[in-house]
């Protein structure tokens, strides 16, 4: 995997070529190569779910029962929805894939810098069991934004209403990066209380760490330069989780299977990117 990522002409070099050329075919080829040879490695060889490396594939979480809830007439009327909710759309995915969207930076960091300079609250966060959008990469992106004072801020524990530390945050002014503990890709599913309180604090202009301070210029968290917490393997699964299992957000792992449960969760499998193809990089 290291060679696939950093080897000559491989993922990193292809990504740089995508940035330099901006061509759809170059970026799509790079996107496909990186996905099939770096992103999917855990799925292929370790049989782990790249969206939650604690789980073996197929991983039944997050459960898909919420789709029926969101498509109920009562909910749609309450939120003013005019179309049905779909968890994913292959047509949209194909459209993004054809341009190599995943491999493009496309001014994302510059856009974040603009938000920061406009004094807009920005919270970047990631679940630390997510390999696909891993927190280490998120931390690097947060540093690239170069928000005033952020490089000198430190990580501190996030206090939530259940008095359990579910995360650590590094914040300077209205810009913050949050590492969510024991969480896969869809953080609100795995850590619902932490997600809700983080969101509530952000939109109300409060500090992410406690929710008690109104954030003003000069506010900065103090603590270690890196988030070094290690949670061990207590929630790692060594057998494929039953499709009928439910997830316990207190113990941060699947509940034991009850014989009374009869519902069946969908067996989800994220598809590979299209097969690699030869691209002329000289034209």
Predicted regions and their residues:
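Histidine-bearing beta->alpha loop at or near hydrolase active sites
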Residues: 129, 160-164, 181-186
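Accessory cap/linker subdomain of secreted extracellular hydrolases
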Residues: 1-123, 128-136, 143-147, 176, ...
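Extracellular/periplasmic catalytic domains that process cell-envelope and extracellular macromolecules
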Residues: 115-117, 168-172, 189
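Short, glycine/charged-enriched secondary-structure capping and boundary segments
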Residues: 137-140, 193
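Short mixed-charge
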Residues: 146-173, 223-228, 232
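Post-His helix in hydrolase/transferase enzymes
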Residues: 189-200
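Generic hydrophobic/packing signal
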Residues: 120, 165-170, 182-183, 268-269
